[in-house]
């Protein structure tokens, strides 16, 4: 479903939209539906070339986002690969590229190939479009990914409206029940 959302953004006419900040905290899941939030780093493709700032989140942003290089849809493809990597490892990628990624033994070569191609340091080796990623993912079988990898990350954010209102106490109480 994430691929469908990004593909929709990339298909906008006359100018595709780049999301440029695909990371776990920007993906919400409710009732088996996926929502992409925080479009603060998003640009139309032609506007992304004239940006005055570096964009993205370390571990999820494509290497070209850390430089003032021209950006295209392949920057988001890198982010999709980083999410796929996070889903099976619970770890962020890094800027060293796909060669440095370590996978659990339960993950087969087919899934690894998809992630590594998405996260290639050189964008010329990445998938050209999101629909190709989606098709490759659909071709995976249950034996390609075992769901018993064992790491299930959980993030709970608490915000207080004033100092000393008990957020720390509530956070500790929640943590002790998990």
Predicted segments, located by residue:
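Conserved C-terminal C-lobe helix
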Residues: 106-121
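Conserved catalytic-loop aspartate of Hanks-type protein kinases
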Residues: 76
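Conserved protein kinase catalytic/activation segment
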Residues: 26-36
């Amino acid at each position: 479903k994430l691929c469908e959302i990004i593909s929709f953004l990339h298909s906008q006419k006359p100018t595709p939209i780049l999301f440029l900040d695909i990371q776990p905290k920007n993906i919400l899941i409710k009732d088996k539906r996926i929502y992409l939030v925080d479009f603060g780093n998003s640009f139309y493709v032609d506007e992304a070339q004239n940006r005055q700032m570096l964009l993205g989140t370390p571990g999820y942003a494509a290497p070209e986002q850390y430089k003032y290089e021209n950006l295209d849809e392949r920057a988001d493809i890198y982010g999709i690969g980083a999410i796929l990597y996070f889903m099976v490892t619970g770890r962020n990628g890094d800027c060293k590229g796909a060669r440095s990624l370590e996978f659990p033994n339960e993950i087969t070569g087919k899934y690894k190939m998809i992630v590594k191609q998405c996260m290639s340091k050189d964008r010329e080796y990445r998938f050209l479009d999101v629909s190709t990623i989606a098709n490759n993912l659909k071709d995976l079988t249950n034996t390609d990914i075992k769901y018993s990898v064992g790491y299930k990350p959980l993030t709970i954010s608490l915000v207080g409206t004033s100092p000393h209102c008990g957020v720390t106490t509530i956070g500790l109480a929640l943590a002790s029940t998990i």
